[in-house]
């Protein structure tokens, strides 16, 4: 029978529930348990696919093509389990399914209500996502007290009642502030958030206290007394230099022993050797490189969360401190293409994105990298931008652009994909009038790499599988002209469309761009060959 750990948060948002939940999962996995994780989002959007990065941060894409919360990226980076669309659902999906059942007549004319119909659907989805695992860690998005979260909290209250205390555990994350003017740690916010939980029938078994300093023993006793939680189950979650220090930090306070005792799990002791090696590598780099990330969401770096982590992973595996400088592509555009801020950079990266804002600034960055032999990595839109720059400045295609930015451009070297074959062999079609939500080329797709290409050398294989999230693609009608001008198509899709997947420049020290998102499959234990190669290229450029 699957055991459930429910992780909730109180007082304020952005405390790090996802990191805490993933750290617990990593510790339990090191004890020999088969662990999965679920994220329940209370917003009414069906998924975050159409949400602004400034509103939501990064959209993480799963292997099976679900557009999900960025916390699923943390889950995959912390445990050896691949997330699917079953590992994430929102209020929008729950209501969508319940209403569809009502329209079919599945409720036999009954009045459809939050209890039991919505809560039953939530429980059904939790059990579905947890099936086959020893332990499922379920993170409830939002903050206890939010009206949107109530159906989810009621559902897990019912699960505790139905499954019992030895099969369910509630871990609540709270904020314990330090008031500098008074020189005191304040526990009152934590007392109030637990009071809020108790009002809806939830008693925390573990309190994880988010703090910027170690908790004094008397404050721990005070929280335990007022919140009716064992003193040893008051666990501190302190500020650390790297999120990968969190599993060891929580383990050192005995959190996994509390969990295994309550859930009656007879398992081996935790072995966090791999995590200690990761932390040691982060804390003891032998080299330093500066990488410019040129994008338009740089005011909220959470928009590039997986990408930032992938570069850090490459740093771990090359013993390098990767220092990222975020460059606003729109500022380059406004300053007439001034890229002087790139001159001290060892490499340049242009990430994915949507829309025309800041595009010419990105093109200027690509031009600088190409003309000055600076290592360049383009991802998704970053590949399309590189191709547009090459088409304009090298192949002589005047007016080269993407129809995403200019529907009537003279040379549409990038255009809307109107038809493609998915990984399972089915064919999808789109046009300009299609809905935006869930209509892109999504999830893992097969890619064939050209023998002898930089792509094949990086991956050490002629066939790879990478995740995608895009609506526009290289226009194959222009490929012959671009190849004649020297561009190398290093990878194409394995389907009948032979869509361009990677491009490279043979007479450049290291210039590579891909249509897919390799950052979604990087983790600190293994890294990713593409990012490792990119950081090595940056190191070589620095030495040169």
Swiss-Prot record:
Activity control mechanisms: Allosterically activated by GTP, when glutamine is the substrate; GTP has no effect on the reaction when ammonia is the substrate. The allosteric effector GTP functions by stabilizing the protein conformation that binds the tetrahedral intermediate(s) formed during glutamine hydrolysis. Inhibited by the product CTP, via allosteric rather than competitive inhibition.
Alphabetized Gene3D superfamilies for the sequence: 3.40.50.880, P-loop containing nucleotide triphosphate hydrolases
Record GO cellular component, one term: cytosol
Documented EC number(s): 6.3.4.2
Active site (UniProt): 380 (nucleophile), 517, 519
Alphabetical GO biological process terms: 'de novo' CTP biosynthetic process; pyrimidine nucleobase biosynthetic process
Residues reported to bind UTP: 13, 186-191, 222
Pathway annotation from the record: Pyrimidine metabolism; CTP biosynthesis via de novo pathway; CTP from UDP: step 2/2
Region (Amidoligase domain): 1-265
Protein's name according to its UniProt entry: CTP synthase
Native source species: Neisseria meningitidis serogroup C (strain 053442)
Gene designation per UniProt: pyrG
